[in-house]
Amino acid sequence: MNTAYRKPLPGTSLDYFDARAAVDAIAPGAYDTLPYTSRVLAENLVRRCDPAILADSLKQIIERKRERDFPWFPARVVCHDILGQTALVDLAGLRDAIAERGGDPAKVNPVVPVQLIVDHSLAVECGGFDPDAFAKNRAIEDRRNEDRFHFIEWTKQSFENVDVIPPGNGIMHQINLEKMSPVIQAQDGVAYPDTCVGTDSHTPHVDALGVIAIGVGGLEAENVMLGRASWMRLPDIVGVELTGKRQPGITATDVVLALTEFLRKEKVVGAYLEFRGAGAASLTLGDRATISNMAPEYGATAAMFFIDGQTTDYLRLTGRSDEQVTLVETYAKQAGLWADTLDHAQYERTLTFDLSSVVRNMAGPSNPHKRLPTSDLAARGIAGQWEEKAGEMPDGAVIIAAITSCTNTSNPRNVIAAALLARNANARGLTRKPWVKSSLAPGSKAVELYLEEANLLPELEKLGFGIVAFACTTCNGMSGALDPKIQQEIVDRDLYATAVLSGNRNFDGRIHPYAKQAFLASPPLVVAYAIVGTIRFDIEKDVLGHDQDGKPVTLKDIWPTDEEIDAIVASSVKPEQFRKVYEPMFARVADAGERAAPLYDWRAQSTYIRRPPYWEGALAGERTLKGMRPLAVLGDNITTDHLSPSNAILANSAAGEYLAKMGLPEEDFNSYATHRGDHLTAQRATFANPTLINEMAIVDGAVKKGSLARVEPDGTVMRMWEAIETYMNRKQPLIVIAGADYGQGSSRDWAAKGVRLAGVEVIVAEGFERIHRTNLIGMGVLPLEFKPGTNRTTLGIDGTETFDVVGARTPRADLTLVIHRRNGERVAVPVTCRLDTAEEVSIYDAGGVLQRFAQDFLESSQAA
């Protein structure tokens, strides 16, 4: 490509592409002022960009302009089994479509390496107090997901460039951090920065290593898999200067929850953050990963740390080879990615955050950016009066206490802190409350090894925190069934029940249908709440219990010291543990076995895997942006959990009724997430969240919460799925009207697929979350944005209207939303077309990512 900039990398047998020379040739001295992100993007352009547009693309970075799109070519795609599987189902369906049109299906393969980790499908049916919980939960997972795992095994053997980590081995982001990311790639004699996109919003976990890794929707991931560039405009790059040091007893969880609140207020949505300064340098890689992981919770696209000695120490600790560690340091220093080469980097905005200001924190209820200092529990109305009656759960009962999520279990300090608190509690005779479903689900098998090395796993097990899985579990809503007696008591007494978890999201209804609210906390606090059993407990002030001598025990009495935590981490976490876990795991991955047939033999009765419908039926017909009726009128902060929930399927839901008709017993309904490879089940999850507030669903004069819609012009309120079926039968084009921050949360492609299959042509909102907006475009749904000061309320939209969209769809063009009111009034409202790039216009005009690829593939085949 741009071979003039290919040069030998000193001290190695490899070459590299000299982005500094390319940038300084345009603007002498400019490279030294570029932020870390810009340097990595510049290298990607110099190595991969068409020479004809290289100079203009680099000028966008050098001059901090956002006037034109430039290409970005990620080195890898990482997927979990839910979105990864649905992406591969789409590619399998694409092979069918290509074959039916006379093309060669075997030529449809990912061009970019794809790593799929099965981590989202295990539910914690057996809690950590069952010594056989891990084996039982895995057996249930295999039984429930046989169809899915059969398909995933076929993809490994049929597609090129697809590696699969089977279930029971850990969480995608933690494996990416501990093993899969080399930080610096070496391929075809060239060294270059590792970059990746992942089908999960927490993909920035490995930004802690200095790797640009961003979450994308499944549809955008498919686009990258198939070899297309990810076109972008220069993002807002914000410097975050970390000063000071943590106070004693403060965990990385406390820090990230404080940062999440701070950064939300600073409005960093969509930005690439670069954490720098003495405070950043003092953080371990595990602490950095906890911070980077929660980028989507504070709204950022990426959360970068620079490569430095902490990075190389971590690479050694996790068993990377000496040669790889040396390459990382050599390349980073040569290419200006080492921390001390970025002293003169300039930012459009720099924020300052003092680590010493952080206190012990939780977050909640309902939002991860709703910081809750543990010293303010009573003042905030969380802690309060409660009484424990024999045989009854208290108000605010903690029914789930889960040490879960890569956010915290990839940080040895957090895990060891929880284990030491458990040890101290056991020594004082404290126990878990019987109604608390406790669990430990690390994101890596290495966690088990270092807990055993420290002789601390038995201490966690004694309190009910035995290992239930190496998977996402409770963090992504797979908390499993409650004890039937506990569930019945919650229903009979209409009890306010809660969950406390070391995860990254706590939206209402996400963790468990019967946990009305959830709170995020550090792993040691999770253990403490399992002991007290209610969120009404003032964790800093109240007495947890009494020891064998009758002496009161408080949290400070059992909280471990930083010195002890650090000493045990230093003595118990070892490189050989990571090698023992990952060397055999990746040896098995490399052995894909015999090649399978290029076309999948779809199972007609499967409710998990079904040939997708995107090239046939209504989606293949003419589209219209006229006469659209609203399916829903929604407020602010609609999440992808509202749009397409992931948690357990209940028997009285539309999906539950369908599965029962298909012959599945209720105990094997599984979660909505696991059925996303079957559109007939998955589309019944559209707007199926019981906490949805559709402002059109007015019953007895008031808006009724639930999965409800009002069919117009009839005016009948009914269940959302029945309304969708009614409109589908009428071939009625639909629109959704919404408030600010539409589509926040998980990077869930079915949040877009579901509305498209329902017949929704347009979403008009006050603002969109980045990943969901690209997913809508990838499905051929048009995102439009109200102008500031205009919204559904100022326009008096009540759902009886019909809507047209008028105007030429070009990047960020002004279009007209025409409202036809029931009384005959016509109102024209200017809106912004949120097709932001020419590439997005091309995808939308083709009907979506897959439709465009099929067209392009057949055209190129015919030309050849």
Regions found by a protein language model. Name each.
Residues M1-A139, L283-N293, E297-S321, A604-S644, ...:
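N-terminal amphipathic, basic-rich helices that act as targeting or association modules
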Residues T37, I184-E329, W338, A422-P434, ...:
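Mobile "lid/hinge" segments at catalytic clefts and subdomain interfaces of large enzymes
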Residues D50-L242, D254-L257, R360-A363, L377-A471, ...:
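Long, structured ligand/cofactor-binding scaffold of large enzymes
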Residues F73, A92-D147, A280-Q385, E540-D601, ...:
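Terminal amphipathic helices with adjacent charged low-complexity linkers/tails
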Residues T243, Y272, R276-L283, N504, ...:
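Extracellular/luminal Protease-associated
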Residues D547-D562, I568, H772-I843:
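Acidic, glycine-rich flexible loop/linker segments
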Residues T674-H675, Q683-V717, E725-N729, L784, ...:
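NTP/phosphate- and nucleic-acid-binding module
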